[in-house]
Structure formats: structure tokens, C-alpha cells
Amino acid sequence: MDLEFAVNGERFKIDSVDPSTTLLEFLRLNTPFKSVKLGCGEGGCGACLVVLSKYDPELDQVKECCINSCLTLLCSVNGCSITTSEGLGNTKKGFHPIHKRFAGFHASQCGFCTPGMCISLYSSLANAENNSSKDFTVSEAEKSVSGNLCRCTGYRPIVDACKSFASDVDIEDLGLNSFWKKGESKEVMFKNLPPYNPKDHLVTFPEFLKKKEKVDNGSDHLKYRWTTPFSVAELHNIMEAANSGDSLKLVVGNTGTGYYKDEERFDRYIDISNIPEMSMIKKDEKGIEIGAAVTISNAIDALEKESKSSYVFKKMATHMEKIGNRSIRNSGSIGGNLVMAQSRKFPSDVTTLLLAVDASVYMLNGRKTEKVTLQEFLELSPVLDSKRVLLKVEIPSWTAPSGDDTEFLFESYRAAPRSIGNALPYLNAAFLALVSRQEASRKGVTVEKCFLAFGSYGGDHSIRAIEVETFLTGKLLSYSVLYEAVGLLKGIIVPGKDTLHSEYRKSLAVGYLFEFFYPLIESGHRICSLDSGNKHNNSHVDTVKSLPFLSSSQQVLESNEFKPIGEAVIKVGAALQASGEAVFVDDIPTLPDCLHGAFIYSTEPLAKIKSLSFRENVTPTGVFAVLTFKDIPQQGQNIGSKTLFGPGPLFADELTRCAGQRIALVVADTQKHADMAAKLAVVEYDTKNLEQPILTVEDAVKRSSFFEVHPMFYPEPVGDVIKGMEEAERKIISSELRLGSQYFFYMEPQTALALPDEDNCVKVFSSSQAPEYVHSVIATCLGIQEHNVRVITRRVGGGFGGKAVKSMPVATACALGAYKLQRPVKMFLNRKTDMIMAGGRHPMKINYNVGFRSDGKLTALELTMLIDAGLEPDVSPIMPRNIMGPLRKYDWGALSFDVKVCKTNCLSRTAMRAPGEVQGSYIAESIIENVASSLQMDVDAVRKINLHTYDSLRKFYNHIAGDPDEYTLPLLWEKLEISSKFKERSEMVKEFNLCNVWRKRGISRVPIVHQVMQRPTPGKVSILSDGSVVVEVGGIEIGQGLWTKVQQMVAYGLGMVKCEGNEKLLDRIRVVQSDTLGMIQGGFTAGSTTSESSCEAVRLCCVILVERLKPIMDQMMMEKSGSVTWNILIQQAYGQYINLSASTLYKPEYSSMEYLNYGVGVSEVEVDLVTGKTEILRSDIIYDCGKSLNPAVDLGQTEGAFVQGIGFFMMEEYTTDEKGLVVQQGTWDYKIPTVDTIPKHFNVEIVNTGHHKNRVLSSKASGEPPLLLAASVHCATRSAIREARKHSLSSNFIDGSDSEFELPVPATMPVVKSLCGLYSVEKYLQGKIKGQ
């Protein structure tokens, strides 16, 4: 039977398809709709989202939800309608209001994530419209994108765009946008928003699909088959008929593939979503039955509808809303979740919740239906096999016996890196208890019955703590009883051998048990009834509060001095990015003969490569070739990258020198086949007669393995350190600090497309920040002249430094394949491979000695630093210079340092946004924190006393300090103190900490000084015959708004010709893609200054063009009265054969090419001492942007950089195993910030300071410096932990005032909890028992 469905209203019929084909594969390969992006392949990023619409003929109703097309199997959408972002609106039929508002609120930067964001918002709006009892509120607006990742914006403008559709929004709370000016009335604001009317803007379901009958859409493809049974009996027959050797897969949403990434192909896929018995929801007074094929979202809805009869159901629903993300819940089934937990040890929240309410399950075993408890189901041995099928779950309804003395209490818990985003928990728990009030004489609460369930702690599956339940049953609750229960629990919660943070997980179990029962002890005879909404609130364990809405304020000053420079112009192509029509490299249509590549990489750090083959010595399907270093042309070289400091190899030769090093490129007919083949590769290694690999900086020191650092990248020391130490009244000696790595997590993985061309030429499309270097490396590798190579880069889906050096081998490998095979070769790295090969930020080890006076004034600092550069130099030799720049932000008195760049057998590290600078600035803060702790002084006072005067600034930065009026840091420091109410809030934090035992707050103010350097940049401006303008620059648009600023600069520059209609010039300018044969010497797009350098380059071009046009203009003005239009002027110039194309290479003056950026950040956090969770309550930023070229762009860069910094300091673990191979390999274990982890109140002020004659129209950089301000969050967390440690020690009669500690980076939940005390609950209870 044909597979029939619709995409954006267009009918598609397919008679045969591989059942393993995903919807995303089909959309990208067989339709023109490229808005669906492959960001992770795991359902964890939201880039692939589409709206799935299903028609229910019985109800004559269309149901819509957003789903992950990267996981959804194509066969499962039979009879459905699919809507992509292009289907909402596009350039042809007009953009949807969602697209327009995303553009107008400046909510798109690189644009790779934007279509998925728009689909998420659209789906939520559609659901609200279809659900008459549910308004689209501000809360729903924030949740609508909670499962989507964005690495650029910091989410604030995205949330504002979403909130603009909310029924309860206060429009004045929305941030900077292009729809209204500050101060306009609410009526004007609402009027200027692009209008949204659900009747006009919701997509309609195609009529031809409403007539489609439900029949088995069985699809045969070679040996694989898809079948769709419509009853349990049919399902049984299909399974019985299967051959004994056949592998079967039952399918609902296929979301499990995102976690387990099954490599095997199944002989038969069975879609069970249409079986009524497995898709039903049945309710009665006994409880609820939920079919195994019911989606988690539908189960949540069913539980919420029954919340009036049982608050237990409501609590379960609330917890389940934290599972995965909305799109995963829309597809993933209850039964699938349970089966994965039973058979594959999936860390399930569902099993824990169901265990706590004593749920049962029904299974089909042959033709028999069996009922077992969930506990028995989880413990089945052998595990569930393909002949047994889970049919439904039965959840009993719990109501307390009549009378006032007895209550049922239910609560669930979940500790995860994100509250509502896509994150597996460290541990989950759910408790149900029947408790009774005893007679007044006894004054207490007795546990009559309880179910205590725990999961995700590293065991085989969720469990009931039976021993603890038995112990507590019948007991009158007291401190000693609870202490004994905790002891029993610690013996039950035993994480598996390789479980990360095992002690932390046990601590969570103890903490949650304490949170549940402790209020009952404190309340005396009163029962803390959640049923009545009267949960006892005390200062020991705060009640779980609903998250406050995100709020923000932005202060920017638009300037008319160089109009349109200085205006908050919408980013070029923002609406195009929102609709998904903006073309990235992987979106470029390819010819049918295009091949695809995937890397085979080493898993050993130092080994000889004996052989390379495939499993069972069978060449996988679709493979055309396997290319190694031996396939490089004889005249070429084994080179895959290069920098100023040397080349790096494309492939390992006979010896692999680090885990993750490229060994070969497998080339196949599809990307899917190439990736599968790479997984099936078998590399045989030999480590005999080889030295031990160098895997740590300590090993590098022992073996003197270092890269040379040129003197120009090694700053001079400042002052006399020996004298400074002699003057010190106090010293901290040999203190150690370590900083880890960070992954770029650009939303678009590394991508390239190479096409062979005539006469030994090759054309390459590369997602790169350095096309010029890509160009040179390819020519060198192939052994051809550079004029035979052409590299084109239009836009890059996020870079942050990761698309500079690391993009080169990807493009070069594709070029090698195309050159050798004479066919196009495209490669799109899967997220795992990308993460393994990325290198990331430089880890380092720091030791220091610091001298200071008793008032906190610093006198001297000595630093010893070891930087892990990895195998190749890359750009690592610049690190000493980059680190020391921001570190000098304080007046150290004197400063000396010994920095070594270590060569190790790890993948080479590379420049990541603010490379070295973020580490240097943080090192300074860590030292200041320890000095303050040593002196028992307020750390803010220590910071303030050591801020530079202008004289000391000159001492540490020399001429780069500029003129005295350019040193704005003291002004910013005082200004933010007032605007953030820093002093008042500091006192409020102290008061909060005195009143709360289990939550502590911290607040911190941090300054930054960031040194940047302008670079030579080419530009070209050409005026076409119709008066439109085309612009080329060496800089690459990577989301930072470079094209927008360049467009504004050209409009300003050409506007010097005073023609009629000049005010509309902006709309007539187009910045085009980078082409290395058309624009040479483009260099690296890095270091924050490429935008301003590119702007200056095109400004100089405009000066040339204006000089050529001015005589004609003057002549025309003399010959005719009145004004001259731009079009007439250009026509006249063309008629006179005036050269209307100008190019230049901007070269900044050496004396002024470097300058300093200043900013201050204040952050306040709250730490939960039970879980270690840190919530950022508020962040205030003030940043000196000079005269902003575009305030909207610079604001977006400031917020985005700050949030990326939060990731580095608080969340993102990017570690390696004992062989140096990266451990984190996707969205499941690498957590960047999401909507629910950014500051709840986020206030940013961009200060437009006075003229800086040596800057480009007095502007300053904004891309990297604000990232350093995120250290304020880390320092505030340290402050909160210090308060927790003080209280903990003082509770045990120990003076904790000078308790020194180092807070690692990142300060994840396990780290914070361990510093606050893994055993704080036990100690607290012991103290209570002693005090009785």
C-alpha cells in the first residue's frame, strides 16, 4: 500500500521506502524544504522540529503537535500532514507573524536554530487555540521553547518574541525591538506588532488526507518491512508469523533511538500506535488505565483532567512535564519508556512515579494477557523479549480514609542540570504516605503506610526502598526515626560501578527523604497536607516555588550622528532565517551523483595502525572508497590545517598520536551510509615498543614536551615581584587552580561540499570562519596551485572559534574525495564525531603566590601556568598573551609569570570565544576571592581597592590604555552599583541567609578589562546599473551581525553623496557570500573586531566611490535646478564609464590597532543545599560599547556571550577518559544553557561613551568581552557556598568564618553539593537529636 502524506499542503505518495528512513532524511533529500536541520540526531536541540497534524474522523477534529523529524520514522506519518517553518510563511507568500516578530525582536543571530524555535512557538499557539480552556500565557510562552537550544542569543530576545503572543503579557516588559520606540504608548505598541489572527495564520489540514482510509501501510524494502496492525490479535499474528531469526521493533515515536542510537537494522518494524487497546485511556473510580502506546503528553493531559479527584495525579503530571522536552513527550510513549527502563536500564522518571503509586502493568504473552506489579515487571528475568508485549498501565486512585486525622501525602523530586529542559536526572524520587495525627498528649504524626521510590541513581532500574518503608510503617516520626531511616536508605541506594557522582546521588536520596518527612516532625501534630494546598512552610526546607517569569530590561542609546550607523536595524536575513529559507552549506542542492563522507578516527592515544577494515570483513552498504594518507596525490602533502604556528595533518600516517585523530575518510552514496560505515570500521592497533602517551600537563613537564612561544605572544612582567612580596603583610603561597575545557556547540556541525571542476580545479563550499586558510590548505594537500581552488562561504551556523582551524580538515577531506573520485563529496559531521574532534577550550593548571596588605591591597603576584594544547600547536602559542591581558585588570603591584604551552597526546585545543581571556579574567577573580577569604574581608571591598587608577592602568597596559577619558571602568563600577541596587541587595542577601538553613544566596560584582586588536580586512563595494549595491568583505557572517553592520556602513558612506532618496539606500544594499577567488586576504573571522574592521574597509571603498561620483553630481546640480535622484546619478555615471567598483585592504595603524574594553557584572544566585542546584535570580550588566554601530546587534552579542559564559562556569562538562577520548558526545550528557537556566531577571545596559578617534566611528567590540562577566555568577555561587559552609561548621560548634575552598569550573550541581556538604542532612539530624 502506498505511503501518503502532505508536506506544507503538498501531496507525497511513496510506494517503497526503507522503514529506517526518518522524516528528516526524507524532507532534506526529497523536498525543497530545508528549514528542518540536523543539529543532534537525538531529539535534544529542536533544530529539526516540524508540526505533525492528524485527522480524527470520528471526532472530525485535527490534532497538532510538534515532533522531532530526526527521530520520527517516515512510515509513521502515513495519512498525516507535516508543516515546516517554510509552510508557515516564506518570501513568496509572505512571512508569518511569528517570523516577523522573531526578526523584529532581534531573536535570530546565526539562524540555524530559528526555524525550530518558530515551529515550537507555532505549535504552542495552535494547541492553545484548539484547547478552548487554555490561554496562551506568558508561562506557556516561556515553556514553548524550553526544549530548543540556541548558542547565540542568550534566549532573552527569543522569549520576548514568544511572549509578545501571550494573552497576559505586559507589553512594556518586552525588550528592544524594531516595532516601537521607547516611551510610546501601549496602544501604539500593540498596533505596531505584526498582527496575529489564529483564523488567518493557522495551517489548514489538506482535504485529500481526510478521505484517506486507515489501512496497513505495509512497506517492503529489500529485506526490511513495515507493518501496521489495528488490533492486539493482528499484532500477535504478525509476531507469530515472523521468522525465528527475524529482529522485530515495535514503534510508536521511535524516540528511544535518540538515546541508544541503534546501529542494527531490524527485519520488521511494527507500528503499534493504531491499536485501540494500546492507545486507550480509561478512567473510573478505581483509577486510570493508560495504554502502552499512549504518548507521554497525552498521559499528562489525562492525569491533569483527573487532578480534581486526586492531587496525586496532578503531581504526577507536573513531574512528567519535566521529562525530555515537549516534542519528545509528544512522540514518546508510556510503554516505550517502561520497556527501555526494564530491558535497557534507561533512567526513567515514569517508572519511579508509577512505583510510588503501586501501579500494575498488563502484558501480552503469546495469546494470554498477564497482570503483574510494576516492580515485578522491572525485575523480569530474562528481560522482556520480542514475544512479550506491554499492553497498558493501571494507576490506582489514592484517597485518604474518612476523618480529619488521616491524610495521604504525595511528592515527587527530580535533580537535573536543567529544571524543565532536556536533561536526565542525577536522581529522581516519588513518595506516597498515609499519615495520621496522634492524640494531643503524644503530639506527633505516625506513618501508617508508605511507598518510597527512587530511580536514575545508577542502578539497574527504579526501585522501592522496601526496608525503609517497613521500618517507617507504624512509627511516630521523630529526628531519631528519620535519622535511622536515612541510614537504612544509604545501604539501599547503591549506584553501579561506573556511575558518575555516585556519592552525590546517594546524598540526593537522603535529602529528598528528609525534605518529605522533616516538615511533619517540625509541624508537631499538624499534618502537612498537599491535598489541601497547605504545605508547611518553614525556614529549614523551603517549599518548591513555581518559577517566576523571566524579566529583563535593556538600556541602549541609538545615535543619529552617522545615520543609519548607530540605529538598531534588524539583522540582515532575519526573517529568511526564521522561515528556514536561509541557505547553509548542507542546504545546497546537490547532484544525484554526490557522494558523502564520514571520518574514521582513532580510539588510542599513541599506537601503530596495523590494519583498517570493517566488521566481518564485509564492505558496508553504499561504500565507494576509504581514503587515507596514502590517497593524497603524490605532488600533495598530508595537511589538514594550518596556522601561523605550523600545519596539522589531515590523516594519521602509520602512527596515530591521539584519540580522536582522523585515520580515514569513508565515502558512500548517502550520509547515512557513510556514518554507518564509519561506525562499523575496525582499526587494529599495536602499542609495542612505543613510549607511554603524554595525557596530562604533569606528564608534559616530566618529559619537557612544550610548544615554543614567540616573544611577541609572551608579555613582559610588570614591576618588581621580589620587592612586592617583601612589602606584603600577608601571603598566600602555592595555591592551585584548575580550569577545564568547553565545547563550542555551534548549532550547525562542521560541514563542507566539494565539487570537481574542469582543468584540475575544485570548488568547495565550507562552513568556515577562515575560507582563505581552507583555500590554501586544500591547494597544498592536493598539490595544485591556489588559483585552481575556490572556496565559498555564505553563512555559518555558529562558530565561536570552532569553525576556524577545525573547519579546515573537513573541507580538505571533501576536496580530496572530489579530486580523487571526480564526483561531488559532501560531509556533515554527526554531533558525536564533531564533539570528539572539536578540541574545545584549553584546560589549564595554575599555581600562584600572592602578596597583599591587611587592608586587601595587593602588592605582588607570581603565576606558574601549564596549558594543555594537545597534539598540534593550532593557535595555542597565543594563549600566554591572551591570558595575561584580562588578568591584569587589577593592580597587582607587581606581576610575574611562567607560562608553558604543553604538547600532549590529546586532540589539539583551539580558540574558543574569548580564548585565554575568560580564563585569565577568572584566575584574577579566584585570587581576589581567596585574598578576601584569608583576610575575612568583604570581597567586593577587596576588588574595589585594587581597581586600577589611570596611572596603574598605563603601568600594566602601556599605550593600549589610551587616553584618560577612555578609561571608563571606575564610572561603570559606580554606575552599576546604583542601577543594580548592589548595596541594598547585599544586605537583603545577608538577611535571607540568616533566616534560611537549606537555601543560601550570594551576590557578586565583577569587573572586566578585555584587550582586542583590529586586523587587516579587505572590502569591495560595487554599484550596479539600477542603483543597487553589492558588497563583499573578508569577514564571515557567523551570526554576529557582520553583514548588518556592513550594510549600515555602506549606506552611511554612500550617503555622503547628497541625493534624493538616499534615506532608502539601506534597502538597496546586499552583502554577498565570501569567495576566495573574488576577495583575497580574508584571514580569520575572530577576535571580536572583524565586524568593525570590515565596516572600515567598506567605508574606505565608499570614500573612493563618492570621490568619483561627486564631480558628476556637482555638474548635474549646475545643469538642472532641484535635487538629483540616486538612480539618475548612477545612470549618468554608467554613461560616462565611471568605475563604480572600489576595493581596498583596510590596515589599522599599529599604534592604535589594540584597545581595551570595559564592563561590570552583578549576579545574585540561590543555592539549594539539598541538591546543589544554583538558580540565577538576577544578573545586571553594564558594558562600554563606544559608539555602537548597531545597538540591537551589540546587545545580542552581549547577552549571548554572557549566557555562553554561564555554560562554561556553571554547567558544561567537557572531559576526556583515560585515553584522552572525549567522554561527552551529545545533548544527553553535554548541557548548554537553556531558557530555564538563564537569569530570571536579566538587565543589560550598553553604554555609548565619548568619541574614540582611533576607533571605527568611535565603536568598540562586543562579541567576546561580555562572556568574561559570567564569572559574576560563579563568584556569587562561591559566596552562597561560603555561607552554607559557615552555617554547617557553626552548627557543629566550629568557627567557619575562614573556611577556605576552591570552587571548580564548571560549578555543576554535584560540585556545589559536595562543597556544601554531602552529609549535611545526617549532621543536621544528629545535631537535632543531641539538642533534644
Swiss-Prot record:
Which family is it part of? Belongs to the xanthine dehydrogenase family.
What is this enzyme's EC? 1.2.3.14, 1.2.3.7
The membrane-spanning stretches of this chain are: none
Upper taxonomic lineage:
Eukaryota, Viridiplantae, Streptophyta, Embryophyta, Tracheophyta
According to the record, how does the cofactor bind? Binds 2 [2Fe-2S] clusters.
Q: Name one GO biological process term.
A: auxin biosynthetic process
Q: What happens when the gene is disrupted?
A: Impaired abscisic acid (ABA) biosynthesis.
What causes induction of this gene?
A: Transcripts are induced by dehydration, in rosettes but not in roots. Induction by cold, ABA, sodium chloride (NaCl) and polyethylene glycol (PEG) is dependent of the zeaxanthin epoxidase ABA1 protein (ZEP). Induction by glucose requires the short chain alcohol dehydrogenase ABA2 protein. Repressed by mannitol.
| Protein location | Cytoplasm
Q: Which residues bind [2Fe-2S] cluster?
A: 40, 45, 48
On the tree of life, the source organism's domain of life is Eukaryota
Name the tissues where it is expressed. Answer: Expressed in vascular tissues of all organs, particularly in phloem companion cells and xylem parenchymatic cells. Highly expressed in roots and rosettes, and to lower extent in seedlings, stems and flowers. Expressed at very low levels in siliques and dry seeds. Also detected in root dividing cells (tips and primordia), in mesophyll cells and inside the guard cells.
Species whose genome carries this gene = Arabidopsis thaliana (Mouse-ear cress)
Relay the record's extra comment.
In vitro, cannot discriminate between (+) and (-) enantiomers of abscisic acid and leads respectively to (+) and (-) cis-ABA.
Domain 2Fe-2S ferredoxin-type residue range list: 1-88
UniProt cross-references to SMART domains, sorted A to Z: Ald_Xan_dh_C (SM01008), CO_deh_flav_C (SM01092)
| Name this polypeptide is given | Abscisic-aldehyde oxidase
